[in-house]
């Protein structure tokens, strides 16, 4: 097999895996976070808590920030019913003076497949 076929098979298997997961429910404490004003060049972090309120394990398939200036960290890629996990969005304010509204899309095995997590921060010169 060549690399193209192997990669295609891998992506198909992953797609089948995600489609076969049982759905669960999630509650997100704050989908929009207002951060304190900071000086340009500082790095800031916004935190979001996702509670698994359903009957099946919650899997985070991906987190997709809308800007390369925003990274992310997930405390756990899976959480069981009754438990929670955290997603942290990390923003580098270098060269971003002014009011910044940033977001990331999160995909999980829930009836609402996509969630938008956002934050706003005023970056001072």
Predicted ranges, named:
Residues 33, 83-89:
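Short strand-edge motifs at loop-to-beta-strand transitions and within beta-strands
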Residues 92-98, 109:
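Short, surface-exposed loop/turn segments at beta-strand-coil junctions that are enriched for proline
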Residues 3-53, 120-125:
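Beta-sheet-dominated interaction scaffolds and their linkers
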Residues 105-112:
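Short, exposed beta-strand-loop hairpins at the edges of beta-sheets
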Residues 55-83:
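Surface-exposed binding patches on compact interaction domains or structured appendages
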Residues 34-36, 74-79, 92:
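Beta-strand-rich interaction surfaces with strong enrichment in secreted/lumenal proteins
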Residues 40, 81, 96-97:
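Surface-exposed loops/turns
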């Amino acid at each position: 097999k060549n690399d193209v076929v192997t990669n295609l098979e891998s992506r198909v298997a992953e797609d089948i895996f995600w489609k076969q997961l049982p759905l669960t429910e999630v509650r997100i404490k704050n989908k929009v976070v207002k951060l304190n004003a900071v000086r340009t060049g500082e790095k800031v972090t916004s935190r979001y808590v996702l509670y698994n309120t359903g009957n099946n394990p919650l899997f985070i398939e991906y987190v997709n920030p809308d800007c390369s200036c925003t990274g992310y960290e997930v405390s756990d890629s899976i959480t069981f019913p009754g438990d929670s996990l955290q997603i942290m969005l990390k923003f580098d304010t270098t060269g971003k003076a002014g009011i910044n509204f940033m977001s990331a899309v999160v995909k999980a095995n829930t009836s609402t497949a996509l969630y938008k997590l956002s934050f706003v921060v005023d970056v001072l010169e």
